[in-house]
């Protein structure tokens, strides 16, 4: 069953475009990992600085298995654009 890893992120003032670009690039990188079922990116319709990034995985174990390789990704641009740490949690799909 697919598991989602959902992150809520806020861009620094004036960095929303940079965060969007970094998350688009991250979605492509995530899709290439074994066990990944892709990623989705949403922007809050009422707050251009607030994003939701959803990684879809075959299982929590599949996500945890790639953590060492994930840490090798160039995360500088994403981290520079963030206004604080992302809020992330695993979710199980109930209806799709």
Question: What residue ranges belong to the model's regions?
Answer:
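Short, surface-exposed ligand-recognition loops at beta-strand->loop->(often short) alpha-helix junctions
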Residues: 10-21
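Short, flexible segments with low predicted structural confidence
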Residues: 1-3, 18, 34-36
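Short alpha-helical
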Residues: 14, 25, 48, 61, ...
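An amphipathic, aromatic/His-enriched active-site/gating alpha helix that lines ligand/cofactor pockets
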Residues: 25-37, 56-89
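Short, well-ordered beta-strand segments in beta-rich or mixed alpha/beta enzyme
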Residues: 3-10, 40-67
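Glycine-rich beta-strand-turn "strand-cap" elements at beta-sheet edges
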Residues: 1-3, 40-49, 76-96
């Amino acid at each position: 069953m697919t598991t989602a890893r959902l992150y809520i992120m806020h861009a620094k003032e004036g960095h929303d475009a940079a965060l969007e670009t970094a998350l688009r690039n991250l979605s492509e990188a995530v899709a290439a990992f074994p066990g990944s079922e892709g990623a989705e990116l949403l922007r809050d319709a009422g707050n251009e600085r607030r994003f939701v990034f959803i990684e879809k995985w075959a299982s929590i174990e599949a996500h945890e298995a790639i953590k060492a390789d994930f840490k090798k990704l160039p995360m500088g641009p994403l981290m520079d654009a963030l206004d604080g740490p992302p809020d992330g949690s695993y979710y199980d799909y109930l209806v799709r």
